[in-house]
């Protein structure tokens, strides 16, 4: 079994779409092994997105991710990373396939409703950033 990390972003939580996204996650065979609702500070968002620190959108990204609560999840299944990325859809919702989370719920490229790890190493870092071992079942 493989684990991946997911975030239901502020734009989706604000519009009360978290339950719908969680339903889709479970309907697609994922086991939720960790989940919590949190309010990130700008500093916490910056630490999480540290790989983007030099990118021009970094400040805006940290502002967005800290403006209201998010749902962080650790998901498990065979091929979890690839399958979650497929279910999310392309980063740009205009390019996402119909039926994906971003195509169905995103407001824009920056407010795209969901985040997912892109590799096993990234998943390990992201899961550990938000969960300790006792919080994962």
From Swiss-Prot:
Localisation: Cytoplasm
The organism of origin for this protein: Pelobacter propionicus (strain DSM 2379 / NBRC 103807 / OttBd1)
CDD domains in UniProt: NDPk_I (cd04413)
Cross-referenced Pfam families: NDK
GO function terms (MF aspect): ATP binding; metal ion binding; nucleoside diphosphate kinase activity
Residues annotated for ATP binding in this entry: 9, 57, 85, 91, 102, 112
PANTHER family in UniProt: NUCLEOSIDE DIPHOSPHATE KINASE, NUCLEOSIDE DIPHOSPHATE KINASE DDB_G0292928-RELATED
Catalytic activity: a 2'-deoxyribonucleoside 5'-diphosphate + ATP = a 2'-deoxyribonucleoside 5'-triphosphate + ADP; a ribonucleoside 5'-diphosphate + ATP = a ribonucleoside 5'-triphosphate + ADP
Gene Ontology cellular-component terms listed: cytoplasm
PROSITE patterns hit by this protein: NDPK, NDPK_LIKE
The protein, known as: Nucleoside diphosphate kinase
SUPFAM superfamilies: Nucleoside diphosphate kinase, NDK
Catalytic-site annotation from UniProt: 115 (pros-phosphohistidine intermediate)
Listed EC numbers: 2.7.4.6
Essential cofactor(s): Mg(2+)
Function: Major role in the synthesis of nucleoside triphosphates other than ATP. The ATP gamma phosphate is transferred to the NDP beta phosphate via a ping-pong mechanism, using a phosphorylated active-site intermediate.
Assembly information from the UniProt record: Homotetramer.
UniProt similarity note: Belongs to the NDK family.
Annotated keywords: ATP-binding, Cytoplasm, Kinase, Magnesium, Metal-binding, Nucleotide metabolism, Nucleotide-binding, Phosphoprotein, Transferase
InterPro entries the record matches: NDK-like_dom, NDK-like_dom_sf, Nucleoside_diP_kinase, Nucleoside_diP_kinase_AS
Protein's gene: ndk
Enzyme's top EC category: transferase
Record-level GO BP terms: CTP biosynthetic process; GTP biosynthetic process; UTP biosynthetic process
């Amino acid at each position: 079994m493989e684990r991946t990390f997911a975030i239901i972003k502020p734009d989706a939580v604000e519009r009360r779409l978290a339950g719908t996204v969680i339903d889709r996650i479970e309907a697609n065979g994922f086991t939720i092994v960790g989940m919590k609702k949190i309010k990130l500070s700008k500093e916490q968002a910056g630490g999480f997105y540290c790989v983007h620190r030099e990118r021009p959108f970094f400040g805006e990204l940290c502002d967005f991710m800290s403006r209201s609560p998010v749902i962080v999840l650790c998901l498990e299944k065979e091929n979890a990373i690839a399958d979650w990325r497929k279910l999310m859809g392309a980063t740009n919702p205009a390019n996402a396939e119909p039926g994906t989370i971003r195509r169905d719920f995103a407001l824009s490229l920056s407010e795209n409703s969901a985040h997912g790890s892109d590799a096993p190493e990234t998943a390990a870092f992201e899961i550990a950033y938000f969960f300790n071992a006792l919080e994962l079942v």
